[in-house]
Amino acid sequence: MTKSIGCDIIKVTRFNSFLQNRKKLDRFFTQREIENLEMKGKGILESLAGKFSAKEALIKALSPLINTKIKYSLKDIEIIALPKGNIIFQLHNDIKVLIEQMDLKLYLTISHEREYAIAFVIVED
């Protein structure tokens, strides 16, 4: 049963400065996410925006379900592309524990078109 949904849309050009500033990348993205971006070649900005949007969409989806304050950073929410092209969340630290304790399933889709990236998350039990 669907417990919650989250959606986030973001302007792709917001991430131009991330390519010139490694500290910004390191603040929001895991090393694995950054390495995967570097292998991408074309479409790096769209991918960055999509991953960031997915992290924000998950937080929005979880917010109404969480009764206690948890400590997390956006790096605790990792976006992984599987060999067939679909994407999943790889969670770390307190947010991972919370999802496991609540026995929730997460579904994610990301799309981008020129100026914008959007992510949509469904949380089910």
Swiss-Prot record:
EC id: 2.7.8.7
Catalyses which reaction(s): apo-[ACP] + CoA = holo-[ACP] + adenosine 3',5'-bisphosphate + H(+)
Its biological purpose: Transfers the 4'-phosphopantetheine moiety from coenzyme A to a Ser of acyl-carrier-protein.
Broad class of where this protein is predominantly found: cytoplasm
HAMAP family assigned: AcpS
A GO BP entry: fatty acid biosynthetic process
A GO molecular-function descriptor: holo-[acyl-carrier-protein] synthase activity
UniProt KW keywords: Cytoplasm, Fatty acid biosynthesis, Fatty acid metabolism, Lipid biosynthesis, Lipid metabolism, Magnesium, Metal-binding, Transferase
Lipid metabolism found in the keyword field: yes
Enzyme class: transferase
Name of this protein: Holo-[acyl-carrier-protein] synthase
Gene Ontology, cellular component aspect: cytoplasm
Cofactor(s) needed: Mg(2+)
Matching InterPro entries: 4-PPantetheinyl_Trfase_dom, 4-PPantetheinyl_Trfase_dom_sf, ACPS, Ppantetheine-prot_Trfase_dom
Species this protein is from: Borrelia hermsii (strain HS1 / DAH)
Family: Belongs to the P-Pant transferase superfamily. AcpS family.
Residues annotated to bind Mg(2+): D8, E56
A Pfam family recorded for this sequence: ACPS
Subcellular location: Cytoplasm
